[in-house]
Design a protein with these regions (language model features):
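Hydrophobic membrane-insertion alpha-helices, especially the h-region
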Residues: 15-32
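Aromatic-capped interface at the extracytoplasmic side
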Residues: 28-46
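Sequence context surrounding c-type heme c attachment/ligation sites in exported
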Residues: 46-100, 128-217
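Carboxylate-rich helix-loop segments that flank metal/cofactor sites and access channels
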Residues: 101-121
Length: 217
């Protein structure tokens, strides 16, 4: 009987299986590398030079976020507190606590404490803290319940898709401006978050940008 197919076709099924395995492995690697929480830094919790507890300072002592992050309402970036801010209290309070060694050394040398950054805006992206907090977006929406954290960690993925989801549905995060820094605020009066958010969205004529130029400048 005549052989209608060339000899190389005998290996065709094996080649197809090999290509499928390579493609499957590549797809698994891309998913693991780009879409897992580890890649997006979720849960990233570096050990800081000073073991600062937001739970103690905010929840237990009642300090306002703006005492330390004093530029958050007027600047695109929320500042890390200076050593002077820390020493306003700690010249008297817990002055001999060894956990404050890095603060004291900074105070004496004039060199800033080498705090480790937790939340990092992606490259080529623009984010303005003042615009958000002055239009009813609380710290909690991006940073989680920081007021209950002993050690700050990255709570959200902060990817482009995550940002766009909020820009498409801002009502899920809007709250009265007076409650932006009340990190334990919950809707009251029988209204849901969506009802309050939709009312504020209409009242303030909020229409967040969804085009590229909104965040990539």
């Amino acid at each position: 009987m005549a052989n209608f197919f060339p000899r190389w076709t005998n290996y065709l099924p094996l080649k197809i299986v090999f290509c499928l395995c390579v493609l499957g492995g590549a797809a698994s690697f891309v998913y693991w590398y780009y879409l897992t929480p580890e890649y997006m830094r979720m849960g990233y919790k570096p050990v800081q030079p000073v073991p600062f507890s937001h739970d103690i300072h905010v929840t237990q002592l009642g300090m306002d976020c703006r005492y330390c992050h004093s530029y958050v309402e007027v600047s695109s970036q929320s500042n890390i507190p200076t050593t002077q801010t820390c020493m306003n209290c700690h010249q008297q309070v817990q002055a001999s606590n060894p956990k404050l060694t890095a603060i004291k050394e900074s105070w004496e040398s004039g060199k800033p404490v080498n705090w480790l950054r937790v939340h990092q805006v992606p490259d080529f992206a623009y984010f303005n803290h003042a615009v958000h907090v002055n239009r009813g977006i609380s710290c909690v929406s991006c940073h989680g319940q920081v007021n209950h954290m002993d050690v700050v960690y990255q709570h959200e993925s902060q990817t482009m898709g995550w940002c766009l989801n909020c820009h498409r549905h801002p009502e899920n995060n809007l709250r009265p401006v007076s409650q932006v820094f009340n990190l334990d605020w919950k809707p009251d009066g029988g209204q849901s978050q969506q009802q309050i958010g939709l009312n504020l969205k209409q009242q303030w004529d909020i229409n967040p940008p969804q085009n590229c130029a909104g965040c990539h400048r």
